[in-house]
Amino acid sequence: LNHIHEACAESQDYLFELKQVTQKLDINIVSAGFDPISKLKEIPNNPKQRYELMTKDMPLGGELSLDMMYRTCGTQLNIDYNSEEDFIKKFKIVNSIVPISIALFANSAIVEKKKSKYLSYRSKVWQSTSRGGLPKIFFEELDFEKYAEFVINFPILFIQHEGAYISGRKYTFKDFMEGKIDKIGNRPPTENDLTTHLSTIFTENRLKKYIELRSMDTCGWDCLCSGPAFFIGMLYGNLDEVYEIISKWDKSKIINAYLEAPEKGFNTQLMGKDLLYWASTLLDLSKKGLEKRDILNKRGKNETLFLNHLQKVIDNRLTNADHMINKFSKTEDLSELYDK
């Protein structure tokens, strides 16, 4: 896919197919970052062997890890980089603006059929999840070598060996590389082992062959394409200007804003301004970036049209979470949360 118009059209096709199936099965779709109805114990376990191991081990490092596994839903965006320098800038930006992303895309305010104190309870859960969060090293000039060091010194979740999943939580990937894991015969890791390890690092953003952005609550069709548009406009069209802004931010203040944003949303403070200010600033830069790209659809519209939803959020100071609360509070009817 070459641009947001194509990605959005493909997403619309998937949604159409999903609705065809769910209507036949009398299943409702809820576009939210957290299951608003079910209690954790009511959700059946995934029968896969790795989920059995994760269900046992994950809570040891984060009290809400099982909620992450079974009750959260996010919109993930994968972006490219064309050089190490390009990666360094993009990765520092996406980590620095996680608090803004949480506030702007908040959509998980209802938990177990009740209004919670959080606008993005999904983000709160991910902050209390084993192997997650925003490591301080992510705010540095993190090149490929430093990221590789971070990865190999990160604890292993599990190892696939002779058809079984084996807990690796007592070992780092470096231990694996040095042949220190007796229960797998001290064998060295394969490329598949590294791929598995990379996929079990649950930080807000992470590097594989591309950068994965994972800080957005999922949302309905009216806003689904706004996330890609917001980030692509900044990172592909206005990278240096955004980088100059975030380079002046103090990492301790970013982390504090990150911890407060799930509950306080736009009222969270960062560098003396609230997150609404920063969201508006970044949206303007994103819009300029998309205008520079000037990629048109068949009707002659450029990609800025996908930012219209976010502009309304900022103008009205009302997120998807606020709309969710308003709908639910009027009647406490959970059907109000279903996609129509």
Task: Show the residue positions of the predicted features.
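Long, well-ordered mid-to-C-terminal structural blocks that present hydrophobic/aromatic surfaces
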Residues: 171-256
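Residue-level marker of positions within ordered structural domains that often coincide
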Residues: 82, 99, 218, 236, ...
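An exposure/low-complexity boundary signal
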Residues: 140-161, 276-303
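Loop-rich catalytic cores of soluble enzymes, especially ATP-dependent carboxylate-amine ligases
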Residues: 23, 28-30, 34-206
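A generic structural motif
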Residues: 1-7, 80-87, 217-221
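Generic structural signal for well-ordered, non-transmembrane alpha-helical segments
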Residues: 16, 92-95, 99, 280, ...
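Terminal catalytic/cofactor-binding subdomain
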Residues: 1-65, 71, 209, 223, ...
